[in-house]
Amino acid sequence: MALNIENIVAELENATILELSELVKAIEEKFDVTAAAPVAAAAGAGDAAAAKDSFDVELTSAGDKKVAVIKEVRGITGLGLKEAKELVDGAPTMIKEGLSESEANEVKEKLEAAGASITLK
């Protein structure tokens, strides 16, 4: 059985975000690696934090209003009901990655208004 890159790419194109997230976790566990980008060695931690231009929105808890949070996650991510529910049920989990500060704060405000606990990273 030959490894066909085109077939793998085609399968990945059809996968949901939740399935891709599970794939990344499985690869990390199997090969004992992380998907995090390499960090520049001793470039000055204070400078790196001040120059941060990309933010990730992490759902830490759905809170008491889980249905409202699921609806908001669907609106933000474009996921279907089942995928959004699985994402919320799997908290803590990333909702959106690579956002600007203003976009991340906007998503955070929407989810917190729905009753969720959010962390920006």
From Swiss-Prot:
GO terms for molecular function: mRNA binding; structural constituent of ribosome. It comes from Lactococcus lactis subsp. lactis (strain IL1403) (Streptococcus lactis). Pfam families: Ribosomal_L12, Ribosomal_L12_N. Signal peptide: none annotated. CDD domains: Ribosomal_L7_L12. InterPro entries: Ribosomal_bL12, Ribosomal_bL12_C, Ribosomal_bL12_C/ClpS-like, Ribosomal_bL12_oligo, Ribosomal_bL12_oligo_N_sf. One of its GO terms (biological process) is translation. Gene3D superfamilies: 3.30.1390.10, Single helix bin. This is Large ribosomal subunit protein bL12. Forms part of the ribosomal stalk which helps the ribosome interact with GTP-bound translation factors. Is thus essential for accurate translation. Homodimer. Part of the ribosomal stalk of the 50S ribosomal subunit. Forms a multimeric L10(L12)X complex, where L10 forms an elongated spine to which 2 to 4 L12 dimers bind in a sequential fashion. Binds GTP-bound translation factors. GO terms for cellular component: cytosolic large ribosomal subunit. PANTHER family: 39S RIBOSOMAL PROTEIN L12, LARGE RIBOSOMAL SUBUNIT PROTEIN BL12M. Keywords: Ribonucleoprotein, Ribosomal protein. Belongs to the bacterial ribosomal protein bL12 family.
